[in-house]
Regions:
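Proteins enriched for Cys/Gly/acidic motifs involved in redox and nucleic-acid/cofactor modification
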Residues: 1-199, 214, 253, 275-286, ...
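Residues at alpha-helix caps and immediate loop-helix transition turns in enzyme cores, especially N-
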Residues: 16-17, 52-56, 205-209, 238-239, ...
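Conserved SAM/AdoMet-binding glycine-rich loop
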Residues: 72-73, 81-82, 86, 184-306
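Short flexible coil/turn linkers enriched for glycine and charged/polar residues
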Residues: 138-141, 151-153, 249, 259, ...
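Conserved, mostly hydrophobic/aromatic
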Residues: 155, 175, 192, 227, ...
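A glycine- and small/hydrophobic-rich beta-loop-beta segment
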Residues: 297, 309-312, 318
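Contiguous mid-protein beta-loop-alpha structural module that forms a pocket-lining wall or clamp
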Residues: 304, 320-321
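Terminal RNA-binding accessory module
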Residues: 339-426
Length: 426
């Protein structure tokens, strides 16, 4: 039996797809490319934007056209918040939301016996238990480790709390065990991920995200630990101190901004203002001088005037990120922001382009500042005679080498920059 996956959206979705694939493989299934004929198709959907919804529907229909006799499973955030949309597509066999993924193989076998559509989408508001989806192998050299699910913030633009529910933390012993297993299998870098990653522990009585970091850096053989995303309010003095002293936690933090204007942040229901945000990052830089910051920015949020956008633009330059992830605001039905006055799409598009150009400028300037320095690089692939990988600062680096370097962590002296850093192994 052959199974094919198509995953849309975030790293959490990628993690969950890999976990489901492992379950199928353990049951004797062979993975094939989504473009090929398969017995089972799994589409892991995204609903962060309208584009995510439409792409999800497109991939579902593509699977049905490829093999009308296949078992087509639809899971994830889109099917969680709008299962009726998926039910309207003829040919879908199984519909799950953001729960019950650990039952997917059994549900496929049940469907193949009865050929009766299965819809298993539960209300996530009351969920308080973390669904353990364990993975012991990845296709890449770095391993992702999902430590929590859900979000309690309810930003006015965001549909995700309705798709994922409240914060639910994985049991500490489960996280530590999986981390040790991954290191034992040869992974030297682990990336902590979740819907609101550093919200880990908010639902636990006496164990915090800081406590988890302390336990993880003690794992023998773990060389690099990366936090996929963390809010300024979650960066405690304890965490700053730990990063400054640890050789394991990388000097790179992705700290979502969303807007660099207090008026916009207030409408978004973000839990900080620009001054608080800037002070926290400045405090980190004092203790960790080499740290770099990347961020997310939403452009064209309802009510965003030209003046507000300019404030965001200037604030971004003031902070000095190394990269921006720029998203045009996408109205999500049922969120408070959907009822606000919307920004013209043309204006939104122009502002997005300005910030993307700024991101390229910031990234190039920072990359060139690394020439002559030594970076620690984890090599992930071979390409056109070079080995390519990411530094601790998440910049891409390539080196020529006669020796096989994939999966290895090496010190590299940076010699030049040509859209990517170029260096040589020390």
């Amino acid at each position: 039996m052959k199974v094919a996956f198509h995953t849309l959206g975030c790293k959490v979705n990628s993690y969950e797809s890999q976990a489901m694939l492992n379950m199928f493989e353990e049951s004797g299934y062979e993975e094939v490319d989504f473009k090929e004929v398969a017995d089972v198709y799994v589409v892991n959907t995204c609903t962060v934007t309208n584009t995510g919804d439409s792409k999800s529907r497109q991939m579902i229909r593509k699977a049905i056209r490829k093999n009308p006799q296949a078992t087509v499973c639809v899971v994830g955030c889109y099917s969680q918040v709008a299962p009726q949309d998926i039910e309207a597509i003829e040919g879908v066999s199984i519909i799950l939301g953001t729960q019950f993924r650990n039952e997917i193989v059994d549900l496929v076998e049940k469907y193949q016996q009865t050929h009766e559509r299965i819809v298993k989408v539960s209300e996530v508001k009351q969920l308080r238990k973390f669904e353990d989806l364990n993975i012991d192998r990845f296709l890449h050299t770095r391993a992702y480790l999902k430590i929590q699910d859900g979000c309690n913030n309810f930003c006015t633009y965001c549909i995700i709390p309705y798709a994922r529910g409240r914060v639910r933390s994985r049991k500490p012993e489960s996280v530590i065990k999986q981390a040790k297993d991954l290191v034992a299998k040869g992974y030297v870098e682990i990336v902590l991920t979740g819907i609101h990653t550093a919200g880990y522990g908010e639902d636990l009585a006496d164990y915090s995200f800081y406590d988890l970091l302390v336990d993880l850096v003690k794992i023998e053989g773990l060389k690099r630990l990366r936090i996929s995303s963390i809010e300024t309010s979650q960066i405690t003095d304890e965490i700053i101190d730990l990063i400054s002293k640890s050789k394991i936690i990388v000097d790179h933090l992705h700290v979502p901004l969303q807007a660099g204007c207090d008026e916009t942040l207030k409408r978004m229901n973000r839990k900080y203002n620009c001054e608080q945000y800037y002070e926290k990052l400045s405090k980190i830089r004092k203790l960790v001088p080499d740290i770099v910051f990347t961020t997310d920015v939403i452009v064209g949020f309802p009510g965003e005037s030209e003046e507000e956008f300019e404030k965001t633009y200037e604030f971004i330059k003031k902070v000095g990120y190394t990269q921006l992830h720029v998203f045009p605001y996408s109205m999500r039905k049922g969120t408070p922001a959907a009822r606000m006055v919307q920004v013209d799409e043309k204006i939104k598009h122009e502002r997005v382009n300005r910030l993307i150009a700024l991101s390229h400028e910031l990234n190039e300037n920072y990359a060139k500042s690394q020439i002559g320095k030594t970076l620690r690089v984890l090599f992930e692939k071979e390409e056109n005679g070079y080995y390519v990988g990411h530094g601790d600062n998440y910049l891409l680096v390539k080196v020529p080498s006669d020796k096989q370097l994939i999966g290895q962590l090496k010190n590299v002296i940076i010699d030049s920059y040509d859209e990517i850093l170029i260096g040589r192994v020390v």
